[in-house]
């Protein structure tokens, strides 16, 4: 009889231990879901830089769906840049409007995750005479992405 009561006690302690682990796991899972709702998953950090290579002042105004980065005027050689985390759906999009005095040069997509996620973590754009050149993580190799409208 003594052996059977020891087995029952052992079984009871094991059951309590397993139930405790299940309850703690559920509580932790719920807490993690609440924390993720407050602070969603952040993708890798991306840096965008725009540099004016023209002899004139270049006005730029950049935005994303969530942020307005403001209006900036760049003299020749000046830079404007910002950093952001690509969202987990890879739908991050930033665009900028460009002008020279009253002349509209165009509105261009500066970053779209579907195009740029693997192209660059440090995306450099150079405003040159013919248009807007994009450089990826290999800075010596730029491409003309957009021609100026005027």
Swiss-Prot record:
Keyword field: Glycoprotein, Secreted, Self-incompatibility, Signal
Gene Ontology BP annotations: rejection of self pollen
Subcellular location: Secreted
Domain of life per record: Eukaryota
GO cellular component, one term: extracellular region
Principal cellular location given in the protein's record: secreted
InterPro entries: Self-incomp_S1
Residues that carry a glycan: 122
PANTHER family tied to this protein: PTHR31232, S-PROTEIN HOMOLOG 24-RELATED
Family: Belongs to the plant self-incompatibility (S1) protein family.
Protein name (record): S-protein homolog 28
Annotated organism of origin: Arabidopsis thaliana
Gene: SPH28
């Amino acid at each position: 009889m003594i052996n059977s009561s020891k087995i029952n006690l052992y079984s009871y302690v094991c059951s309590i231990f397993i139930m405790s682990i299940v309850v703690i796991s559920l509580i932790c899972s719920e807490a993690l879901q609440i924390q993720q709702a407050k602070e969603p998953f952040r993708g890798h950090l991306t840096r965008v830089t725009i540099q004016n290579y023209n002899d004139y002042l270049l006005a730029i105004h950049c935005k994303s769906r969530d942020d307005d980065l403001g209006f900036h005027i760049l003299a020749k050689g000046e830079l404007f840049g910002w950093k952001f985390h690509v969202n987990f759906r890879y739908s991050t999009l930033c665009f900028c409007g460009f002008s020279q005095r009253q002349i509209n040069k165009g509105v261009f997509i500066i970053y779209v995750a579907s195009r740029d996620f693997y192209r660059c973590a440090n995306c450099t754009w150079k405003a040159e005479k013919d248009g807007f050149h994009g450089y990826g993580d290999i800075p010596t190799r730029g491409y003309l992405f957009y021609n100026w409208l005027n």
